[in-house]
């Protein structure tokens, strides 16, 4: 048996088991419509499901809001207060010093582009950007475009260097990364969790390498800046931005219960103050600061909020954080959702550690069960403690896209393709993989149903659509319906 498919030992300790018994997943699932749709929702790395409360809030806000920073009416001022409070909540939840560290964007991709355009004029001929082969396209393509398409037009040659990862373990090759960073490395880009391999690079070690580069930044610092892609890390872990020590951290709320259209760039305030904004126009300029011969920027964070923002999306996104606290904290805690209660960082740590523990247990179960599927190759670390809550794999003789389609026919949500992680797939010599991914509303029964369906498809052929009951050794829950129809419309 290859290392890619060898069985693993469960990581559940007695303490973890007691914690899981206290985790009220059935109560949590009662907040979501998908549980009534007869589907196994295991494509959460792409997007999570929105709970009732956020959908209701969004509908309510649509009927009563006005624009922000653009009116003296009671409705406008009320909406402005809620909108600005959302920035405070986001900063508090992530351990950022203040709202001045927060840039609200559409998604993680836009966050990376915002960094790229903000720093673009600072690059000098002969500089380089160091990234890794673990990156999502959103943290590779902008830098490729900068180095190969944009800066050469201005006579500046900037190299893009990529650090390898170990193909067996999926771990980032820190020695190779260190060899690429030098005194001309302006920026180091690294994911906090791969959306394909699940790998969680040691950001503290990456930060130390960036800090030691001796690159002369325009603000007088001698180090490389560090951009961390947190799209797959922030939704399932306790985040302390100040402790992380990164200059930039990105993520999207659609992977964290909120509807689509809101992402966040958390950034070093000094860099936001000294860098140029990504977009220009209304509200990002100061009152009375626009003249024919000069323009003055607004104070942070509004310097990076040009034009009418996604007001409703931003308010709902911040409330998603509050709702996560209510769902993840133990019963009896005062509620955060729809309240003015100041977010307590201790509560954030307790809640997100519980989320991480539960996701880890589901991932360990999936890894262990996948080891028994004939011909299956699992990619990335075998230890659930060293990876995010997803599993990507291939099965000999089966096209991954056809596997995902067959899983869909069996009522299981999956994703196949390169997951926008083309570099990592090419490094392993494959074009695509099939992926299952979990969030804190999933259950051990969900894992069993997904992998039982996969095993049936592999054994019977890719057109199989019947999901057998989970074996008693892996689940004590009732078996699912024999056939779960493919999603046909709204889940509401």
Q: What would you call each of these model-derived segments?
A:
Residues 2-476, 480-492:
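Pyridoxal 5′-phosphate
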């Amino acid at each position: 048996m290859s290392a890619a498919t060898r069985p693993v030992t469960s990581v559940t300790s007695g303490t973890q088991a007691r914690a899981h018994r206290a985790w009220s997943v059935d109560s949590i699932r009662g907040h979501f419509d998908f549980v009534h749709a007869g589907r196994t929702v295991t494509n959460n790395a792409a997007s999570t499901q929105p709970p009732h409360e956020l959908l209701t809030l969004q509908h309510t806000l649509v009927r009563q809001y006005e624009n922000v920073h653009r009116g003296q009416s009671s409705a406008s001022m009320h909406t402005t207060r809620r909108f600005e409070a959302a920035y405070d909540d986001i900063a508090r939840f992530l351990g950022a010093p203040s709202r001045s560290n927060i840039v609200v964007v559409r998604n993680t991709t836009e966050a990376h582009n915002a960094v790229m355009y903000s720093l673009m004029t600072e690059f000098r001929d002969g500089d380089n950007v160091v990234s890794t082969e673990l990156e999502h396209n959103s943290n590779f393509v902008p830098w490729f475009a900068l180095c190969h398409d944009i800066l050469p037009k201005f006579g500046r040659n900037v190299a893009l260097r990529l650090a390898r990862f170990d193909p067996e373990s999926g771990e980032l090759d820190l020695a190779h990364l260190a060899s690429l960073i030098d005194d001309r490395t302006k920026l180091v880009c690294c994911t906090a969790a791969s959306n394909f391999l699940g790998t969680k690079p040691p950001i503290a070690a990456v930060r130390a390498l960036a800090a030691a580069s001796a690159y002369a930044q325009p603000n007088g610092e001698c180090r490389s800046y560090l951009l961390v892609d947190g799209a797959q890390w922030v939704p399932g872990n306790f985040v302390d931005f100040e402790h992380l020590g990164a200059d930039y951290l990105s993520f999207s709320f659609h992977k964290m219960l909120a509807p689509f259209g809101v992402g966040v760039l958390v950034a070093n305030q000094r860099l936001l103050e000294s860098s140029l904004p990504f977009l220009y126009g209304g509200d990002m300029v100061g009152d009375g600061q626009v003249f024919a011969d000069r323009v003055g920027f607004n104070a942070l964070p509004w310097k990076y909020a040009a034009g009418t923002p996604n007001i409703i999306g931003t308010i709902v996104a911040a409330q998603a954080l509050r709702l996560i606290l209510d769902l993840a904290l133990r019963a009896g805690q005062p509620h955060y959702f729809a309240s003015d209660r100041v977010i307590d960082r201790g509560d954030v740590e307790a809640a997100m550690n519980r989320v991480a523990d539960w996701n880890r247990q589901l991932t360990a179960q999936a890894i262990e069960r996948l080891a028994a599927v004939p011909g299956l190759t699992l990619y990335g670390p075998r230890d659930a403690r060293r990876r995010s809550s997803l599993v990507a794999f291939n099965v000999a003789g089966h096209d991954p896209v056809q596997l995902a389609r067959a899983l869909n026919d069996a009522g299981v949500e999956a994703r196949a393709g390169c997951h926008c992680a083309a570099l990592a797939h090419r490094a392993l010599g494959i074009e695509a993989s099939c992926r299952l991914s979990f969030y804190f509303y999933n259950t051990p029964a969900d894992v069993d149903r997904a992998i039982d369906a996969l095993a049936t498809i592999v054994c019977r052929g890719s057109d199989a659509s019947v999901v057998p009951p989970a074996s008693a050794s892996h689940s004590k829950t009732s078996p699912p319906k024999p056939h779960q129809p493919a999603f046909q419309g709204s889940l509401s």
